From Swiss-Prot:
This is Serine hydroxymethyltransferase. InterPro entries: PyrdxlP-dep_Trfase, PyrdxlP-dep_Trfase_major, PyrdxlP-dep_Trfase_small, Ser_HO-MeTrfase, Ser_HO-MeTrfase-like, Ser_HO-MeTrfase_PLP_BS, SHMT-like_dom. PROSITE patterns: SHMT. The gene is glyA. The record marks H229 as: Plays an important role in substrate specificity. Keywords: Amino-acid biosynthesis, Cytoplasm, One-carbon metabolism, Pyridoxal phosphate, Transferase. Disulfide bonds: none annotated. SUPFAM superfamilies: PLP-dependent transferases. It comes from Francisella tularensis subsp. mediasiatica (strain FSC147). (6S)-5,6,7,8-tetrahydrofolate binds at L122, G126, H127, L128, S355, P356, F357. GO terms for biological process: glycine biosynthetic process from serine; tetrahydrofolate interconversion. Catalyzes the reversible interconversion of serine and glycine with tetrahydrofolate (THF) serving as the one-carbon carrier. This reaction serves as the major source of one-carbon groups required for the biosynthesis of purines, thymidylate, methionine, and other important biomolecules. Also exhibits THF-independent aldolase activity toward beta-hydroxyamino acids, producing glycine and aldehydes, via a retro-aldol mechanism. PANTHER family: SERINE HYDROXYMETHYLTRANSFERASE. One of its GO terms (molecular function) is glycine hydroxymethyltransferase activity. It is found in: Cytoplasm.
Amino acid sequence: MFSFEKNSLKNTDKEIFDAIELEVKRQHEHVELIASENYASPAVMEAQGSQLTNKYAEGYHGKRYYGGCEFVDIAEKLAIERAQQLFGVDYANVQPHSGSQANAAVYNAVLKPGDTVLGMDLGAGGHLTHGSKVNFSGKIYNSIQYGLDENGDIDYEQVAQLAKEHKPKMIIAGFSAFSGIINWQKFREIADSVDAVLMADIAHVAGLVAAGVYPNPFPYVYVATTTTHKTLRGPRGGLILCNNNPELAKKFQSAIFPGIQGGPLMHVIAAKAVAFKEALEPSFVDYQKQVLKNAKAMEKVLKQRGINIISGGTSNHLLLLDITNTGFSGKEAEAALGRANITVNKNSIPNDPRSPFVTSGLRIGSPAITTRGFKEKECELVANLLADVVFNCGDEKVENETAAKVLDLCDKFPVYK
């Protein structure tokens, strides 16, 4: 028998308890600019930390291989129904443990080993699972990669040319570091010209799509995958969506279970359901609109400060910064900003001469700071502070002065009260 008091984390494992406390302190004291990060609500965290973690539930709701699933079935059914409503589709699989797992399941459902896949190059802003040679997607399948044009937009002419030349079985439209708007219709026209399945990876923009402030990939795509954190502000996990295609939906269902996963994480699925309910509220639309405004506010200041933005600016929540002209690498800038209580991630830029471990760029985004309550005024300040540090990496005085300003700002906008 367990006692919530006697067997608390603090009493049971002080090392882990202390590590969590330090992370809570870091999250309060640092401005979070990593584009793929956000803050989950107390309700989401409560569901994820619930006793649902104890329940094994192989299979799908109503069709389990274990008894005692009648209540976790409620949670999964709610998650599915809310996801369908949120994205306007008739099929949602809420069981993928991550976005990468969701992608892997789609590949397994649609492709055979050795089939050709056309996806965005990692160096141009794509994701590892879009065909990178170091990832399963580039090892199991014949991966062909497209990039950006001279204006920093997706090179649709190249996509069409590569599709015509290589006849891919599937084309992936999606990104992890691209600040533009994807033309889903143009991708569909290219896919149809070679009889390819079109898949959208909307992991970064799912919240924007759900709120109607970024183009919805349906009805142009056959299937969309996403994570459930990032702009969706839920727990870390994955999601598969499709519409008006029961044959494909059946394949995705079996591709997840028993294809690549066993028991689903019912506590995470419950947390997904909570996040989807939150995303269906009118306030979520207001939040996503502010995400876009805040990204544009940072763009304006960074341009004024002489920092180059790949693609010329942003039309979503993220900005990819080329900091070559500062004389410092992405690795150096990330470390310096960390000392100044600003969290970013180093990121390769198109045709980057530096390795992915060093880079010439930084990727920043507005979802987390918007959740925190920042508006344009605060984001302009943050962008100026970022520029102060990036042009003066290693200057202890600049870093310390910036950290003090960041701490003052963070105290005014606590993440959790």
